[in-house]
Amino acid sequence: MNTATGVIALLVLATVIGCIEAEDTREDFQGGFESDDGEAAEKIFRRAPVCTRTDQPCPYDQDCCSGSCTLKKNENGNLVKRCD
């Protein structure tokens, strides 16, 4: 076996080992990690919700920090919803 074949074999082996270790946990839809073996909900780590600051566009699924969102003109003169 020459050097190139040995390097390729080591890369394949490292990839296989990495895939086997990566099977133990998978990222859930909010960025936390969930175990394959059915851990309880309190053991799943999730990111904390974040509110949108003043003068930022109002997103569809998040609340503004101030609690209100109104139509305002942007730099192009168009009306857009922004957090108060």
Curated annotation (Swiss-Prot):
Key words, A-Z: Calcium channel impairing toxin, Cleavage on pair of basic residues, Disulfide bond, Ion channel impairing toxin, Knottin, Secreted, Signal, Toxin, Voltage-gated calcium channel impairing toxin
Sites marked Critical for insecticidal activity: 57, 74, 82
Tissue spec: Expressed by the venom gland.
Signal sequence range: 1-22
Source organism, top-level taxon: Eukaryota
Molecular function as annotated in GO: calcium channel inhibitor activity; toxin activity
A Pfam family of this chain: Omega-toxin
Positions of the propeptide segment: 23-45
One GO cellular component term: extracellular region
Principal location listed in the UniProt entry: secreted
Family matches, as InterPro entries: Omega-atracotox (IPR009415)
Family: Belongs to the neurotoxin 08 (Shiva) family. 01 (omega toxin) subfamily.
Function: Inhibits insect, but not mammalian, voltage-gated calcium channels (Cav).
Protein name: Omega-hexatoxin-Hmo1b
